[in-house]
Amino acid sequence: MKTVTVKDLVIGTGAPKIIVSLMAKDIASVKSEALAYREADFDILEWRVDHYADLSNVESVMAAAKILRETMPEKPLLFTYRSAKEGGEQAISTEAYIALNRAAIDSGLVDMIDLELFTGDDQVKETVAYAHAHDVKVVMSNHDFHKTPEAEEIIARLRKMQSFDADIPKIALMPQSTSDVLTLLAATLEMQEQYADRPIITMSMAKTGVISRLAGEVFGSAATFGAVKKASAPGQISVNDLRTVLTILHQA
């Protein structure tokens, strides 16, 4: 399986990489949060742009991106607008969503974008091609905050992302039972062993699914999300605790 390299970070080998989400509402809080995050132990900075209030002002959005880039120049920056239908803060039209991601790609400030699988097949394919033409990697994602589908469906979604040339397919699902967590882990393992030719990221959410955030190296998930301050999804644990556990499992 090929790895994905962003800056000096190699994703898809060794212990899962730690992603943290920054969720600031304005320029001032982007600055203060960035300074606080700079001291934390993580690998990839995800900027959750759907939390930003002034989204209609693309110049303001890119000014905030510039602050993040300048504050943490060595960290890969993942630009993520999470749609309301997949658990984000604000609803957005498909056209505005694509335009915002293209503006981020054009800016030269971001290393990766998050692109939701169910945005629309044509829009997804075109945006992936546009990102790759500008040397920006694509994390293609799907989130269900209500349920966990069957393993076959989980694998089908990850394979579809791979067929759309996502650099890193990602899926996050809500378990209704402990067996749902096993379904996610079994699907991850089957995908990793039989179909994946690139790194994938999977997780089962909430307290029930915490084990999936820790056991990525065992089952085949290349990255996991931790919390510096406020968790961006249910079940995230602090980056310090997360790094400790990932290191223990890696060295075992």
UniProtKB/Swiss-Prot annotation:
Substrates-to-products reaction catalysed: 3-dehydroquinate = 3-dehydroshikimate + H2O
Domain of life, source organism: Bacteria
Entry annotated with the keyword DNA repair: no
Pfam annotation, one family: DHquinase_I
InterPro entries recorded: 3-dehydroquinate_DH_AS, Aldolase_TIM, DHquinase_I, Type-I_3-dehydroquinase
EC numbers, comma separated: 4.2.1.10
Swiss-Prot/TrEMBL keywords: Amino-acid biosynthesis, Aromatic amino acid biosynthesis, Lyase, Schiff base
Biological process, per Gene Ontology: 3,4-dihydroxybenzoate biosynthetic process; amino acid biosynthetic process; aromatic amino acid family biosynthetic process; chorismate biosynthetic process
Active site per UniProt: H143, K170
Enzyme class, first EC level, given as a word: lyase
Pathway, per record: Metabolic intermediate biosynthesis; chorismate biosynthesis; chorismate from D-erythrose 4-phosphate and phosphoenolpyruvate: step 3/7
Protein family: Belongs to the type-I 3-dehydroquinase family.
Reported function: Involved in the third step of the chorismate pathway, which leads to the biosynthesis of aromatic amino acids. Catalyzes the cis-dehydration of 3-dehydroquinate (DHQ) and introduces the first double bond of the aromatic ring to yield 3-dehydroshikimate.
Quaternary data: Homodimer.
Name of protein: 3-dehydroquinate dehydratase
Organism: Escherichia coli O6:K15:H31 (strain 536 / UPEC)
